């Protein structure tokens, strides 16, 4: 058979014809096999999302501080600091920020649906933030729970075609469990001011679980599943504080998942210093994110 006849046809899957056995010291055979591969499928690991559209995109912030009495949920003191910090950080990155405070569940879903019907053809991406209490696979609006999947489903490719292939970022600041993370490292405590401005630490009730959302989604959670998310009554939540600081310092230069890893590290170095629940003193927190992104994501400054 000639050399030309032995060559595989272009585009065909190529396999090693036979695994190669080797014999180990104890007499057993160690066989190495090669997985099939398609020569056409070559991926550039450095490929980035196209972020040079006319607009950066829309960022929705649903901020919930107060809740209907029958839910028996405490007010989320300090959440206004989170809302304002996020507005500043996202605006600096070029987003059109829309803020909604203490909306009922029906109104939240209406605003989300309206956003999903917008035309994002000339936008880079989309951001949606929830600052609230959470439970299982839900977050709380003013008067009722909302299933997170109900929200993310509105931005899938068959529902929001102008965001197909573009990053869809969801940030959830809510508790995800009923446990505190025990500290393993000692950290210097934060000095408190006079009693009227003491910055106490509180937790966001109940738990939120990670959900699949589809390609080009990234779900950013303030805490790993099963643990409390901490919020300071003056400065806001640990996660949003450190996220906004990282966005301010590195938002236009660092790849987004790398930036989130920096935030994980910063939050993990914190611990509870002042809290009405004495069992929470000294406890820690670790955020997490679930990335379904398919390319690297940068928020490089837009040319003017």
From Swiss-Prot:
Q: Which InterPro entries match?
A: Caspase-like_dom_sf, Caspase_cys_AS, Pept_C14, Pept_C14_caspase, Pept_C14_p10, Pept_C14_p20, Pept_C14A
Composition skew (Polar residues), residue ranges? 17-29
Question: What EC number(s) are associated with this protein in UniProt?
Answer: 3.4.22.59
Instruction: Cite the active-site annotation.
Output: 133, 175
Q: List the disulfide bonds.
A: none
Which SUPFAM superfamilies does this entry report, sorted A to Z? Caspase-like
**A GO molecular function for this record?**
cysteine-type endopeptidase activity
User: Which enzyme type, at the first EC level?
Assistant: hydrolase
**Regulation affecting activity:** During activation, the N-terminal prodomain is removed by cleavage. Concomitantly, double cleavage gives rise to a large 18-kDa and a small 11-kDa subunit. The two large and two small subunits then assemble to form the active CASP6 complex. Intramolecular cleavage at Asp-191 is a prerequisite for CASP6 self-activation.
Superkingdom: Eukaryota
Q: Map out region (130's region) in residue numbers.
A: 137-154
Using the UniProt annotation, give all residue ranges assigned to the region (Disordered).
1-29
Q: Where does it localize?
A: Cytoplasm; Nucleus
An example Gene Ontology CC term for this record: nucleus
Positions annotated as pro-peptide in this chain are: 1-35, 192-204
- Tri-arginine exosite: region residues: 54-56
Known tissue expression: Widely expressed.
What family is this? Belongs to the peptidase C14A family.
Function, as annotated, reads: Cysteine protease that plays essential roles in programmed cell death, development and innate immunity. Acts as a non-canonical executioner caspase during apoptosis: localizes in the nucleus and cleaves the nuclear structural protein lamin-A/LMNA thereby inducing nuclear shrinkage and fragmentation. Lamin-A/LMNA cleavage is required for chromatin condensation and nuclear disassembly during apoptotic execution.
Q: How does it assemble?
A: Heterotetramer that consists of two anti-parallel arranged heterodimers, each one formed by a 18 kDa (p18) and a 11 kDa (p11) subunit.
Copy the domain comment: The N-terminal disordered prodomain is required to prevent self-activation.
Q: What is this protein called?
A: Caspase-6
Organism encoding this protein: Gallus gallus (Chicken)
Taxonomy of origin reads: Eukaryota, Metazoa, Chordata, Craniata, Vertebrata
């Amino acid at each position: 058979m000639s050399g030309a006849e032995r060559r595989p046809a272009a585009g065909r899957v190529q396999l090693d014809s036979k695994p190669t056995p080797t014999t180990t010291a104890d007499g057993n055979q160690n066989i190495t096999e090669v997985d099939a591969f398609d020569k056409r499928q070559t991926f550039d690991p450095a490929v980035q999302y196209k972020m040079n559209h006319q607009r950066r995109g829309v960022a929705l912030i649903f901020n919930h501080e107060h809740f209907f009495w029958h839910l028996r949920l405490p007010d989320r003191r300090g959440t206004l600091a989170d809302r304002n910090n996020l507005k500043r950080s996202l605006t600096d990155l070029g987003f059109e920020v829309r803020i909604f405070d203490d909306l009922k569940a029906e109104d939240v879903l209406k605003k989300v649906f309206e956003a999903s019907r917008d035309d994002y053809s000339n936008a880079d991406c989309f951001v949606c933030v929830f600052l609230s209490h959470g439970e299982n696979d839900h977050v709380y609006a003013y008067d009722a729970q909302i299933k997170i999947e109900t929200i993310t489903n509105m931005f899938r490719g068959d529902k929001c075609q102008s965001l197909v292939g573009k990053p869809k970022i969801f940030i959830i600041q809510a508790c995800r469990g009923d446990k505190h993370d025990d500290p393993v490292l000692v950290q210097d405590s934060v000095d408190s001011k006079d009693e009227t401005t003491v910055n106490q630490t509180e937790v966001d009730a109940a738990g939120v679980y990670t959900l699949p959302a589809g390609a080009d989604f990234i779900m950013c959670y303030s805490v790993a599943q099963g643990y409390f998310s901490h919020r300071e009554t003056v400065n806001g939540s640990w996660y949003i504080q450190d996220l906004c600081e990282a966005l301010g310092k590195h938002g236009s230069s660092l790849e987004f998942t790398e930036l989130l890893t920096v935030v994980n590290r910063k939050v993990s170095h914190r611990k509870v210093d002042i809290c009405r629940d004495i069992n929470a003193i000294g406890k820690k927190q670790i955020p997490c994110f679930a990335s379904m992104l398919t390319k690297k994501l940068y928020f490089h400054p837009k040319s003017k």
